[in-house]
Swiss-Prot record:
The modification Phosphothreonine is found at residue 121. Residues 221-244 are annotated as: Disordered. The modification Phosphoserine is found at residues 54-55, 60, 159, 192. The keyword Oxidoreductase does not apply. The mitochondrial isoform is widely expressed while the nuclear isoform is testis-specific. Keywords: Activator, DNA-binding, Mitochondrion, Mitochondrion nucleoid, Nucleus, Phosphoprotein, Repeat, Transcription, Transcription regulation, Transit peptide. Residues 1-42 form a transit peptide. This is Transcription factor A, mitochondrial. Monomer; binds DNA as a monomer. Homodimer. Component of the mitochondrial transcription initiation complex, composed at least of TFB2M, TFAM and POLRMT. In this complex TFAM recruits POLRMT to the promoter whereas TFB2M induces structural changes in POLRMT to enable promoter opening and trapping of the DNA non-template strand. Upon metabolic stress, forms a complex composed of FOXO3, SIRT3, TFAM and POLRMT. Interacts with TFB1M and TFB2M. Interacts with CLPX; this enhances DNA-binding. The gene is Tfam. The modification N6-succinyllysine is found at residue 66. Binds DNA via its HMG boxes. When bound to the mitochondrial light strand promoter, bends DNA into a U-turn shape, each HMG box bending the DNA by 90 degrees. It comes from Rattus norvegicus.
Length: 244
């Protein structure tokens, strides 16, 4: 399982353009976003039909163990790149075999979904759709965060309070995380104005670091055609930089 979890992580780094897995891969490598299949409906009610793997993912899951056996010391990222290259060079006739399997399973899947929904009450169906929307939004946000991490977006600046917490949390004498945070929070409130000024200055320095790194990063994004990630305007949060 760890091997395939690693595979999923690397697959999302292979490129931005491509067709979505859920629509079938064709000859192009899926994008980081499309590599994560988000079920149109998923419910905690259980027994929801499992969505079939795309042609490319099916090929990848077949090839990864073989590559791992041949190259036991190689990183998963290196193996995935080799598999991606192998897929690109795969004859169209062989790709069509994978695509045909996907289409056949997709048809069975859609029929199973229809039968599953027929068994639900109106209230259960509404709950299913609501849950699906929430999961899609949550997954979309997760994918966006992961993409920004992969693209090296600078970490946001920390407030004076957050810097103090990161320095003091482990030293707090309490076994529970909640207890530690409570102690650290009280200790912050008890700091004198002069003591807090040191952390406020660190926060200001971190803001300068962030602004400089963001300027450089956005220039890089413009160069690689990702202007959609560039801020239209820089908005500073209201309030003192020391606020938590």
């Amino acid at each position: 399982m760890a091997l395939f979890r690693g595979m999923w992580g690397v697959l999302r780094t292979l490129g931005r353009t491509g067709v979505e897995m859920c629509a079938g891969c064709g000859g192009r490598i899926p994008s980081p976003v499309s590599l994560i299949c988000i079920p149109k409906c998923f419910s905690s009610l259980g027994n929801y039909p499992k969505k079939p793997m795309s042609s490319y993912l099916r090929f990848s899951t077949e090839q990864l163990p073989k590559f791992k056996a041949k190259h036991p010391d190689a990183k998963v990222s290196e193996l995935i790149r080799k598999i991606a290259a192998m897929w690109r060079e795969l004859p169209e006739a062989e790709k069509k075999v994978y695509e045909a399997d996907f289409k056949a399973e997709w048809k069975v899947y859609k029929e199973a979904v229809s039968k599953y929904k027929e068994q639900l009450t109106p209230s259960q169906l509404m709950g299913l759709e609501k849950e699906a929307r929430q999961k899609r939004l949550k997954k979309k946000a997760q994918i966006k965060r992961r993409e920004l991490i992969l693209l090296g977006k600078p970490k946001r600046p920390r407030s004076a309070y957050n810097i103090y917490v990161s320095e003091s949390f482990q030293e707090a004498k309490d076994e529970s995380a909640q207890g530690k945070l409570k102690l650290v929070n009280q200790a912050w409130k008890n700091l004198s104005h002069d003591e807090k000024q040191a952390y406020i200055q660190l926060a200001k320095d971190d803001r300068i670091r962030y602004d400089n790194e963001m300027k450089s990063w956005e220039e890089q994004m413009a160069e690689v055609g990702r202007s959609d990630l560039i801020r239209r305007s820089v908005k500073r949060p209201p309030g003192d930089i020391s606020e938590n």
